[in-house]
Design a protein with these regions (language model features):
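Alpha-helical segment of the N-proximal tetratricopeptide repeat
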Residues: 6-65
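Structural signature of tandem alpha-helical TPR/SEL1-like repeats
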Residues: 21-31, 57-69, 90-103, 125-137, ...
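Structural marker of alpha-solenoid helical repeat scaffolds
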Residues: 36-40, 73, 107, 141, ...
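Conserved alpha-helical positions within TPR/SEL1-like repeat arrays
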Residues: 45-56, 79-90, 113-124, 147-155, ...
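Short coil/turn linkers that connect adjacent helices within long alpha-helical scaffolds
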Residues: 71, 105, 139, 178-181
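TPR/TPR-like (Sel1-like) alpha-helical repeat modules
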Residues: 150, 154-180, 193
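Alpha-helical linker/edge segments of TPR/alpha-solenoid repeat scaffolds
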Residues: 164-167, 190-205
Length: 205
C-alpha cells in the first residue's frame, strides 16, 4: 500500500464507505483521492484510484487496466493485487483470481483486506475451512473488523458450527458503530434468532 499517510487514510476511508456506506459516498471519496494523487504527481496512487472509480461504475475490465498500471509503478501494493482479483471475480474469472490474492499477501503480508477477500471467495465456492483460516488471519491483523466476523459467522454456519456462528454474529453487533448499518443489524438479528432456534431445538428435541 502507499507509503504516503494521506493516501493510506483515503484508502481506508474509501474501503469503509464501500463496506458500510453507499456507492455514492464511495465514489465521492475516490474522486477526491484521485484529485489529491494528481496534485501530488503520485502516479501509482492516481492509477489505483482511477481503478476504484471504474470498479464503482461496474467497468471491471477498465479497472483491471488501471490496477495493472498501479502494480507496475508500485509492485508492493497489496491493495492493487487484491482489487484486481475482485474485478476478475466480477468478470467470472474466478480460479485465476487466487494468484492475485496470493501475490497481494506476498508483497504486503500485513494488509488485512486481502486475507478477508480471499476468505470471502473461498467461502462462496464451498471451501469453508480454508475461508475460516483466512478470516482468522484477518482478525489477527484487525481484531475489530465487523465485516470479517460476519463472513466468519457465515462460514461457521455452513459447517454447522452454530455455536461458533452465533458468537461471531453477536460480535458483529458489538463492533458496528451505533446509528449506522441498520439493515445489516436487522439481517444479523434475524440470523441470530434462527441460530438460537436451531440450538434450542437440538437441546429440546
Amino acid at each position: 500500500m502507499s507509503g504516503h499517510c494521506v493516501f493510506l487514510d483515503l484508502r481506508t476511508e474509501l474501503d469503509n464507505a464501500i463496506t458500510y456506506g453507499t456507492k455514492a459516498a464511495a465514489a465521492k471519496i475516490a474522486r477526491k483521492a484521485l484529485e489529491k494523487a494528481q496534485a501530488a504527481s503520485a502516479g501509482a496512487e492516481e492509477e489505483y484510484f482511477r481503478g476504484q472509480i471504474e470498479m464503482l461504475r461496474g467497468n471491471h475490465s477498465a479497472a483491471i487496466k488501471h490496477f495493472d498500471a498501479a502494480i507496475k509503478l508500485n509492485p508492493a501494493d497489496g491493495a492493487a493485487f487484491n482489487d484486481r482479483a475482485l474485478c476478475m471475480i466480477e468478470l467470472g474469472i474466478i480460479d485465476k483470481a487466487f494468484p492475485y490474492f496470493d501475490k497481494g499477501i506476498e508483497v504486503e503480508p500485513d494488509y488485512a483486506n486481502v486475507y478477508h477477500n480471499k476468505g470471502w471467495l473461498l467461502n462462496n465456492i464451498g471451501r469453508h475451512r480454508e475461508a475460516i483460516a483466512c478470516f482468522k488471519k484477518t482478525l489477527e491483523l484487525e481484531p475489530e473488523r465487523p465485516v470479517t466476523y460476519d463472513n466468519l459467522a457465515d462460514a461457521l454456519y455452513n459447517l454447522q458450527d452454530y455455536g461458533g456462528a452465533l458468537k461471531a454474529y453477536k460480535k458483529v453487533l458489538e463492533l458496528l458503530k451505533p446509528g449506522i448499518c441498520r439493515q445489516i443489524r436487522k439481517q444479523i438479528g434475524i440470523k441470530i434468532k434462527q441460530i438460537e432456534k436451531k440450538l434450542n431445538s437440538a437441546l429440546n428435541p
